[in-house]
């Protein structure tokens, strides 16, 4: 965890994190004005694993995801109660540098959103903003990030071409590479393949499986087969509540809750 994440000394001691967990969510509730969107969620997120969040539209899974790096702060009516511990520090606290937090917990959205700049400039934009000016360092990070995102071989000869000239699937992998360039520990993916064709979707899934060796990944998906293919653990949300959370195979083959079984079997959603 970067020291830059803490703006000032915490008011109370940092809690020793649980072994093998990158995040600990404790009694988290999220509100939009007077409407409660997420109700008292408790869950631990494993390191170097893929955690899938599933559930019908409006169940709270994306709201929950966006709160992990405080993207909900951008919504004036949004507020959160409870704790999200990252390396033992409550990242919902007022002493948190949110910009630094979002470097360590990066996010990729449903629709690819490359900047209207070159492929190279998309990767280096945030790095330069953070003060990095050494071209050799920037070149190295660009190649490393694009390689991790399985895009380097496709674009290495046109790095200074517009990112908007890439296909939708390539643009999404570029957005992943742009996030990886900031060297996050956690990667949040909000339905990253839902707007893509089947071939691009398969590439994104293959990429996710490979990235968990270095990153802890949380993915929101409406595609239950995708959750089954790529995730190690699955959380089922319904009406803002965490109904069931466990190993993906167990959730899909022998869920403990009837609501989970009904959703998995397509009885609603």
Swiss-Prot record:
SUPFAM superfamilies: P-loop containing nucleoside triphosphate hydrolases. It catalyses: phosphate(out) + ATP + H2O = ADP + 2 phosphate(in) + H(+). Residues 23-264 form the ABC transporter domain. Its EC number is 7.3.2.1. GO terms for molecular function: ATP binding; ATP hydrolysis activity; ATPase-coupled phosphate ion transmembrane transporter activity. It is found in: Cell membrane. ATP binds at residues 55-62. InterPro entries: AAA+_ATPase, ABC_transporter-like_ATP-bd, ABC_transporter-like_CS, P-loop_NTPase, PstB-like. One of its GO terms (biological process) is phosphate ion transmembrane transport. One of its GO terms (cellular component) is plasma membrane. The keyword S-adenosyl-L-methionine does not apply. It is a peripheral membrane protein. Keywords: ATP-binding, Cell membrane, Membrane, Nucleotide-binding, Phosphate transport, Translocase, Transport. It is an enzyme of class 7 (translocase). Its main location: membrane. Gene3D superfamilies: P-loop containing nucleotide triphosphate hydrolases. Part of the ABC transporter complex PstSACB involved in phosphate import. Responsible for energy coupling to the transport system. The complex is composed of two ATP-binding proteins (PstB), two transmembrane proteins (PstC and PstA) and a solute-binding protein (PstS). PANTHER family: ABC TRANSPORTER I FAMILY MEMBER 17. NCBIfam families: 3a0107s01c2 (TIGR00972). Belongs to the ABC transporter superfamily. Phosphate importer (TC 3.A.1.7) family. This is Phosphate import ATP-binding protein PstB 2. It comes from Bacillus subtilis (strain 168). The lineage of its organism: Bacteria, Bacillati, Bacillota, Bacilli, Bacillales.
